[in-house]
């Protein structure tokens, strides 16, 4: 047996379905589309969400919320993430280099999730009240 002699097991591969190629193929004439109607015509299919003229669901429900334009430029960083960092001073550049925030991010906020056991100085980042308390309890500080 050699690599150029290998063949797939019998019945494991199927030929591509060729529709509309004669009666003997089993998929000739109407080519599996049935008789008449919109779905049998070429290009004849409704758009996504169309409900046959009934008011579609996306129009029956009220509008809600909005897409924030600043979402891509803001980020959250947890105390758990900061604990894993080697740096004693943490700022936006350090977070970007560590891959904790994206390159487009312009401002980040530290949130209280996880524990902080070492002294850390936070520069130029926001912090929640709980995160501030945890950072200061560990001997760290938040610089403006």
UniProtKB/Swiss-Prot annotation:
Q: Which SUPFAM superfamilies match?
A: Ribosomal proteins L15p and L18e (SSF52080)
Q: Where is this region: Disordered?
A: 1-48
Designated name of the protein? Large ribosomal subunit protein uL15
Matching InterPro entries: Ribosomal_uL15 (IPR030878), Ribosomal_uL15/eL18 (IPR021131), Ribosomal_uL15/eL18_sf (IPR036227), Ribosomal_uL15_bac-type (IPR005749)
GO MF entries = rRNA binding; structural constituent of ribosome
**Superkingdom of origin:** Bacteria
Q: Which GO terms describe its biological process?
A: translation
Role: Binds to the 23S rRNA.
Q: Which is one Gene Ontology cellular component term of this protein?
A: cytosolic large ribosomal subunit
- Complex formation: Part of the 50S ribosomal subunit.
Provide the taxonomic classification.
Bacteria, Pseudomonadati, Pseudomonadota, Betaproteobacteria, Burkholderiales
Listed A to Z, the keywords are:
Ribonucleoprotein, Ribosomal protein, RNA-binding, rRNA-binding
Cited Pfam families? Ribosomal_L27A
Q: Which family does it belong to?
A: Belongs to the universal ribosomal protein uL15 family.
Q: Does the keyword RNA-binding apply?
A: yes
Q: Name its species.
A: Cupriavidus taiwanensis (strain DSM 17343 / BCRC 17206 / CCUG 44338 / CIP 107171 / LMG 19424 / R1)
Which stretches are tagged as biased composition: Gly residues?
21-31
The answer to whether the entry has keyword Metal-binding is no
